[in-house]
């Protein structure tokens, strides 16, 4: 059968300088000195329990993983995320494709978050040159360099540019590795095709990022701490640009998934915090934990003493730790993220909170402040 394929080459692509943004980082950023709103007694206890478990994990060199949705970046939480990472409280950060983009836009222009309703109406939502061109190109180059999704973008921000190889070098690489390393050969020919298609010049492509100090990806890259990106096809604005390359996204995202899974392997006595991620976090966690258990069982071990805290705005009156999984006729059963994580063993808790309040309270208590 013949199906129609949308031609992105026909799109009229705007520049970011034409776009109004709702979030201005230096105006809206959350300071480390800012105090969170007060929590209930139960909420305070959960944060104290989480702090206690993080301290144990740090002492035992177990993973402390923080996985979050894009709103954590849009809410200008970078100062807190960077502090948690740089002060050694968190060993792995993970977000979705939108989180990667919002962080990059902040590094590139100091602002992010367009008006979706207005821009869809005028046929312009997500159809912007700079994020579409630079992020996709960073991922294509990163795939050739065998990097992860988040690492590819973090490296571009850190270096404020990309190295574009000679196309003849890429052809040679393709020929050399076609049999011994087909993946490397394929990534090389993909990059060569991109260079030819867009008429890119070999050498250094400068891409200034004047606000990079606010980028979590940049700070993670510089600190050699995993910041993994877990995108889904068609979910993010970079898919509207002709530079977008599915194979490169697949290669880099797979690298990041396997890096994420490697951190889950080290989760015995560790901590997993899922903040504002209803789909991505529980879905990649359950597969990763299953793989990790598979390896541990081969060694005669098992991951049992892990701690999971789920944080989201939705209210839930169900005690997952005490009552187990609710029946199918209870609304809590359809809180997919709670249900999935509850099936993962260990100690699990749910906290209804704004991510700003939770992360601030967590950081302050880790620092010994109230």
What residue ranges belong to the model's regions?
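N-terminal glycine-/serine-/threonine-rich phosphate-binding loop
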Residues: 2-82, 90
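A general structural motif
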Residues: 43-48, 208-209, 231, 246-265
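Glycine-rich phosphate/diphosphate-binding loops that line cofactor/substrate pockets in enzymes
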Residues: 48-63, 219-223, 262-269, 370
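Short glycine-rich or small-residue beta-strand-to-loop segments that form or flank ligand, phosphate
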Residues: 62-71, 93-95, 271-278
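Active-site histidine-anchored catalytic micro-motif
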Residues: 75-77, 82, 86-138, 211
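Short gly/pro/ser/thr-enriched loop/turn and capping motifs at secondary-structure boundaries
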Residues: 98-103, 235-238, 281, 315-317
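Ligand-binding beta-strand-loop-alpha-helix segment within the catalytic cores
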Residues: 115-223, 228-229
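C-terminal functional extensions of proteins
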Residues: 250, 259-263, 269-271, 278-370
């Amino acid at each position: 059968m013949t199906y129609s394929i949308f031609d992105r080459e026909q799109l009229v692509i705007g520049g970011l300088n034409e776009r109004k943004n709702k979030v201005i980082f230096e105006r809206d950023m959350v300071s480390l000195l800012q105090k969170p709103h007060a929590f209930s007694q139960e909420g305070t206890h959960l944060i104290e329990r989480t702090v206690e478990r993080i301290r144990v994990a740090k002492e035992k060199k177990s993973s402390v993983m923080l996985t979050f949705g894009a709103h954590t970046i849009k809410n200008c939480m970078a100062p807190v995320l960077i502090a948690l990472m740089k002060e050694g409280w968190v060993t792995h950060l993970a977000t979705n494709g939108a989180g990667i983009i919002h962080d990059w836009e902040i590094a590139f222009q100091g602002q992010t978050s367009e008006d979706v309703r207005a821009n869809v109406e005028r046929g312009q939502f997500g159809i912007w040159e700079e994020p579409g061109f630079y992020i996709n190109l960073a991922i294509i180059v990163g795939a050739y360099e065998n990097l992860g999704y988040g690492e590819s973008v973090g490296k571009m921000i850190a270096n404020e540019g990309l190295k574009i190889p000679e196309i003849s070098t890429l052809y040679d690489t393709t020929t050399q590795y076609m049999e011994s390393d087909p993946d490397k050969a394929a990534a090389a020919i993909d990059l060569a095709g991109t260079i030819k298609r867009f008429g890119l010049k070999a050498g250094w492509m400068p891409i200034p990022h004047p606000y990079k100090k606010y980028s979590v990806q940049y700070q993670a890259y510089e600190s050699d701490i995993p910041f993994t990106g877990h995108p889904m096809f068609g979910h993010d604005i970079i898919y509207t640009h002709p530079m977008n390359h599915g194979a490169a996204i697949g290669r880099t995202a797979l690298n990041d998934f396997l890096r994420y899974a490697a951190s889950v392997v080290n989760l015995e006595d560790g901590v997993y915090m899922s903040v504002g991620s209803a789909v991505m976090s529980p879905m990649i966690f359950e597969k990763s934990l299953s793989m990790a258990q598979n390896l541990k069982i081969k060694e005669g071990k098992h991951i049992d003493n892990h701690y999971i805290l789920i944080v989201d705005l939705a209210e839930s009156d169900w005690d997952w730790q005490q009552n187990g999984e609710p029946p199918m006729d209870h609304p809590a059963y359809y809180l997919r993220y709670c249900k999935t994580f509850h099936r993962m063993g260990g100690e699990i808790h749910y906290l209804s909170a704004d991510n700003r309040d939770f992360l601030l309270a967590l950081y302050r208590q880790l620092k010994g402040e109230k």
